C-alpha cells in the first residue's frame, strides 16, 4: 500500500469515526484541538487504525500520535 493510499484510508476512517468533513482534515490537524476529538474518540480511532492496517500501536506510541500526519507516518513505517 502506498503512502497516498494509506493517507486516503486514514482520512476515511477519521471522517467515519469523528463525523468531520474530509475537507476539514489537513495533515497538520490535531485530533483534539482541530478535529474535536476527546480522549475516547482518540482511543477508538487508534483501535480502528490498528484493525484496518493490521498493526499494533502500543500505548506509549499512541500517546505520541496527535496529528493526522503522525498517524500516517506511523502506519507507513510499519
From Swiss-Prot:
It comes from Chlorobium phaeobacteroides (strain DSM 266 / SMG 266 / 2430). Disulfide bonds: none annotated. Pathway: Lipid metabolism; fatty acid biosynthesis. One of its GO terms (cellular component) is cytosol. 4'-phosphopantetheine is transferred from CoA to a specific serine of apo-ACP by AcpS. This modification is essential for activity because fatty acids are bound in thioester linkage to the sulfhydryl of the prosthetic group. The keyword Lipid biosynthesis applies. It is found in: Cytoplasm. Keywords: Cytoplasm, Fatty acid biosynthesis, Fatty acid metabolism, Lipid biosynthesis, Lipid metabolism, Phosphopantetheine, Phosphoprotein. This is Acyl carrier protein.
